[in-house]
Amino acid sequence: MYKLTTRQQEVLDLIKSHIEDTGYPPTRAEIANQLGFRSANAAEEHLKALARKGAIEMVPGASRGIRLPETIQGIPLIGRVAAGNPILAEQNIEDYCDVPPDFFYPQANYLLKVQGMSMRDAGILDGDLLAVHSTTQVKNGDIVVARIEDEVTVKRFKRERNNATIQLLPENPDFNIIEVDLRDANFSIEGLSVGIIRREL
């Protein structure tokens, strides 16, 4: 494991938090501004040191050309989610897809294998890989990954005006709307759909 100076660790932490918040790495100028460096060149020197130690990879010629090693193996592919387990639990990961997380915006934290045709009319088909950004912050109309009790589902999100009821809307008339009463249901938002990958037709 690489050993970092305090300042290098601060730069690395900033890169990670910026990617998590925005989906892409910071520029040299943004790093310099947030950490109080005199210039972007000072940030560049810290980035080069981090790259030498293997903490990051630098992509030449790009203002945001910074990659974290953990993103290089690709995005975790989640198959069936075992009841009660966190989505990214090791036993749920079937594989890694060789697509950089920042291919999507916001960045994808995992790919979820779609089961069924309830979202057909939104262009999401059985067997598709849904790119998901881990967040609990969603708005009406977003396509979300939601957990109800121990079941995980992909639906369009709608919060009723009373704020006590959530509707999860299918995009296929053959499927029923799921209505969730937040006062007595174990419900959570696991993530936001940010794209799909279709491996075969």
Swiss-Prot record:
UniProt KW keywords: Autocatalytic cleavage, DNA damage, DNA repair, DNA replication, DNA-binding, Hydrolase, Repressor, SOS response, Transcription, Transcription regulation
Known EC number: 3.4.21.88
GO terms under biological process: DNA repair; DNA replication; negative regulation of DNA-templated transcription; proteolysis; SOS response
Domain of life, per lineage: Bacteria
InterPro entries linked to this entry: LexA (IPR006200), LexA-like (IPR039418), LexA/Signal_pep-like_sf (IPR036286), LexA_DNA-bd_dom (IPR006199), LexA_repressor (IPR050077), Peptidase_S24_LexA (IPR006197), Peptidase_S24_S26A/B/C (IPR015927), WH-like_DNA-bd_sf (IPR036388)
Catalytic reaction annotation: Hydrolysis of Ala-|-Gly bond in repressor LexA
Function statement: Represses a number of genes involved in the response to DNA damage (SOS response), including recA and lexA. In the presence of single-stranded DNA, RecA interacts with LexA causing an autocatalytic cleavage which disrupts the DNA-binding part of LexA, leading to derepression of the SOS regulon and eventually DNA repair.
Record's subunit section: Homodimer.
Family named by the database record: Belongs to the peptidase S24 family.
The name this protein goes by in its record: LexA repressor
UniProt organism field: Saccharophagus degradans (strain 2-40 / ATCC 43961 / DSM 17024)
Taxonomic lineage from the root: Bacteria, Pseudomonadati, Pseudomonadota, Gammaproteobacteria, Cellvibrionales
Gene expressing this chain: lexA
